[in-house]
C-alpha cells in the first residue's frame, strides 16, 4: 500500500485502533488532534502485544510442566507440542503488532494528514452515533452468532464497514474489501473469512430492502 495514495485506509486503521480510547460528544471529538489518534492506536497495539506475550509465556510454562511430568507419555508430549505451537503463534502476533506500531506514525506522516484525521473522526463519530442501528443490522444477519461474543477487533471492523456502507456512502464492495484487508492485518484467517461472510450477507439484505 502506498501511504500517499491510501489516506482513507490509514484513517480506517486509526479509527479501528482508537475506538475504545477516543470517546465523547461530537463537539469533543472535533477537537481531537491527529497525534491523539496515533497515540490511542499505539496504546491499543501495545496492550495487545503485552497480552499476547503474557499468554505465550504462560503456554511455554505449561508445556514445560507437561514435559517434566512425564517425558515418555505420548499424550503429554503431544499436548506440550501443541502449547509450544500456540505460544509461537502468539509471539508472531505480538511481532506483527509491534511492526504496526512502528508503521502507523510513518504512514500518517507520508499521507494527507488532514484527510486522514477528518475521515478517522467521521468514522468514529458515526460508529458511536449510529451504534444501535449498526448493531441491529449486524444482529439481523449473524445467524447463531452474537456480536458481543466476537473478538473486539472483529466487532469493530464489522461496525466500521457497516457504518461506511449505510451512513458514509462508501460503495459496498469497497467497504467489504477494505474490511477484509484490515482484518488480514489485525485478525486471523478465521476472523477475516467470517467478517467477509457477514458483510456479504449485509449487502444482500440491503439489496433486498432496496428492491421493496
Swiss-Prot record:
Belongs to the NusB family. Involved in transcription antitermination. Required for transcription of ribosomal RNA (rRNA) genes. Binds specifically to the boxA antiterminator sequence of the ribosomal RNA (rrn) operons. HAMAP family: NusB. GO terms for molecular function: RNA binding. It comes from the Bacteria. The gene is nusB. This is Transcription antitermination protein NusB. One of its GO terms (cellular component) is cytosol.
Amino acid at each position: 500500500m502506498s501511504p500517499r495514495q491510501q489516506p482513507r485506509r490509514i484513517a480506517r486503521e486509526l479509527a479501528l485502533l482508537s475506538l475504545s480510547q477516543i470517546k465523547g460528544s461530537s463537539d469533543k471529538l472535533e477537537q481531537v488532534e491527529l497525534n491523539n489518534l496515533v497515540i490511542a492506536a499505539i496504546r491499543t497495539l501495545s496492550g495487545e502485544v503485552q497480552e499476547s506475550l503474557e499468554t505465550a509465556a504462560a503456554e511455554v510454562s505449561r508445556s514445560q510442566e507437561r514435559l517434566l511430568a512425564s517425558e515418555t507419555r505420548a499424550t503429554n508430549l503431544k499436548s506440550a507440542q501443541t502449547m509450544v505451537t500456540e505460544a509461537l503463534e502468539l509471539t508472531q502476533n505480538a511481532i506483527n503488532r509491534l511492526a504496526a506500531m512502528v508503521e502507523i506514525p510513518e504512514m500518517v506522516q507520508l499521507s494527507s494528514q488532514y484527510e486522514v484525521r477528518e475521515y478517522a473522526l467521521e468514522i468514529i463519530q458515526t460508529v458511536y452515533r449510529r451504534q444501535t442501528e449498526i448493531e441491529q443490522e449486524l444482529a439481523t444477519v449473524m445467524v447463531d452468532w452474537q456480536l458481543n461474543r466476537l473478538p473486539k477487533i472483529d466487532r469493530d471492523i464489522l461496525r466500521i464497514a457497516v457504518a461506511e456502507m449505510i451512513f458514509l456512502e462508501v460503495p459496498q464492495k469497497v467497504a467489504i474489501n477494505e474490511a477484509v484487508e484490515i482484518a488480514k492485518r489485525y485478525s486471523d484467517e478465521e476472523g477475516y473469512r467470517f467478517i467477509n461472510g457477514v458483510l456479504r450477507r449485509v449487502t444482500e439484505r440491503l439489496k433486498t430492502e432496496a428492491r421493496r
